Swiss-Prot record:
SUPFAM superfamilies: Serpins (SSF56574). Belongs to the serpin family. Keywords: Glycoprotein, Protease inhibitor, Secreted, Serine protease inhibitor, Signal. This is Serine protease inhibitor A3A. The record marks 383-384 as: Reactive bond. PANTHER family: SERINE PROTEASE INHIBITOR A3A-RELATED, SERINE PROTEASE INHIBITOR, SERPIN. It comes from the Eukaryota. The keyword Secreted applies. GO terms for cellular component: extracellular space.
Length: 422
């Protein structure tokens, strides 16, 4: 199975004074020369960051689910939090506090410098080629050609967040729109074709954050075994959807009686993983209401290898976009969208606010073969774990999490209510 998630985040400041410059070759200054103890300390901090990101992810998911009832959901909490953290480099005062506290950081206990350092370390580790999964993440700022930025912001944005910048003539909104959309289309391998459609002449900055993920199942789903099966929408309705099927596999499995759901983990080559949360019929609202950071910790601690006779999953493709202007204020991030915003750390000017914040995400779940010897090893390692026949059908609404290969931070999260609805 091949999985691709492509995500774009746009911020536009309409007060005429925002820009920054950064190049694409920025690295995490200092990490290659640090001692092993310090590097180990950073990795431990990155695990803590992943836990904090889980809190943010679940809080944001609940807001999205409330705003989008009866709809499929797909978004990247990691992409959104990284973009907000990057923006906070230029924020001051209450604007800064709102952003970081909205991201679930406890500022008295967590120095701001540590937050940025660990975000940078996390993003850097994600894109390492030895991870085997293909992850491409970064930021781009499209800036008005008349504006100047502060050196400190420029250097930090480049070093910590892999930011690059493009001079843009926003007085020609059609050309500026094409420049941004062409960049996003290229970085997301064509999955997101139009992020911007209504740029105004008084726009001064557009910040794009992208996260592109491609992984290959560590199990085999033969396309010839895909069949049309029933997917239950509610008590009265079902739809016929393509169902991928595989047999005789070992996968991590946990029955959560408290949450009234089945949790199953499928791994990708390279140790990233796809977590299915399959509530009992009619209990998805209960699961959503119960989501807490400790929920993920409990699932990961409780998952055990289980031999399955058969597993069937829906084949689906999702694409959604969200206006975060309406959602982030409910998480406490308000001032940055108002005339009281203080983003003076970008240019030195205080007449800057964010007028538009858009998040688009696309997710494809399909079959992809992997090397046969991988499957053979998986099948023979745990033959003794099979006690009785076990068939798992993901044939009703479910939640899902994509966890990164190193720190198990939530890269992508969402819900499938109807696999046929894009």
């Amino acid at each position: 199975m091949a999985f691709i998630a492509a995500l774009g985040l746009l911020m536009v400041g309409i007060c005429p004074a925002v820009t920054y410059w950064a190049t694409a070759d920025g690295q995490l200054g200092g990490h290659t020369a640090v001692q092993k103890d310090r590097d180990h300390e950073i990795q431990l901090d990155s695990v803590t960051l992943a836990s904090i990101n889980t809190d943010f992810a679940f809080s944001l998911y609940k807001k999205l689910a409330l705003e989008n009832p009866h709809k499929n959901i797909v978004f990247s909490p990691l992409s959104i939090s990284a973009a907000l953290a990057l923006m906070s480099l230029g924020a001051k005062g209450n604007t800064l506090e709102e952003i970081l506290e909205g991201l679930k950081f406890n500022l008295p206990e967590t120095p701001e410098a540590d937050i940025h350092q660990n975000f940078g370390h996390l993003l850097q580790m994600l894109i390492q080629p030895e991870n085997q999964v293909q992850i491409n993440a970064g930021n781009a700022l499209f800036i008005d050609k008349h504006l100047q930025i502060l050196t400190e912001f420029k250097e930090k944005a480049r070093a910590l967040y892999k930011a690059e910048a493009f001079t843009t003539d926003f007085q020609r909104p059609r050309e500026a729109t094409k420049l941004i959309n062409d960049y996003v289309r290229k970085q997301t391998q064509g999955k997101i074709k139009e992020l911007v459609s209504d740029l105004h002449r008084n726009t001064s900055m557009a910040l794009v954050n992208f996260l592109n993920f491609q992984g290959f199942w560590n199990v085999t789903f033969d396309p010839e075994d895909t069949f049309l099966g029933n997917f239950t929408l509610d008590r009265k309705r079902t739809v016929n959807v393509p169902m991928m099927k595989t047999e005789e596999l070992t996968t991590n499995y946990f029955r959560d009686e408290e949450m009234q759901s089945t949790v199953m983990e499928l791994n990708y080559i390279g140790n990233a993983s796809f977590l299915f949360i399959l509530p009992d019929q009619g209990r998805i609202q209960h699961v959503e209401d119960s989501l807490q950071p400790q929920s993920l910790r409990k699932w990961r601690k409780s998952l055990r290898p289980r031999m399955l006779d058969e597993l069937s999953l829906p084949k689906f493709s999702l694409s959604q976009d969200y206006n975060l202007n309406d959602i982030l204020p409910e998480l406490g991030i308000k001032e940055v969208f108002s005339t009281q915003a203080d983003l003076s750390g970008i240019t030195g000017a205080k007449n800057i606010r964010v007028s538009q914040m858009i998040h688009q995400a696309a997710l494809d779940v399909t079959e992809t073969h992997t090397e046969a010897d991988v499957i053979t090893i998986a099948r023979y390692n745990f033959q003794s774990a099979k006690i009785k026949a076990k068939i798992v059908k993901v044939d009703r609404e479910f939640l899902y999490l994509i966890l990164d290969p190193m720190f198990k931070s939530i890269s992508v999260m969402g819900k499938v209510i109807n696999p046929l609805t894009n």
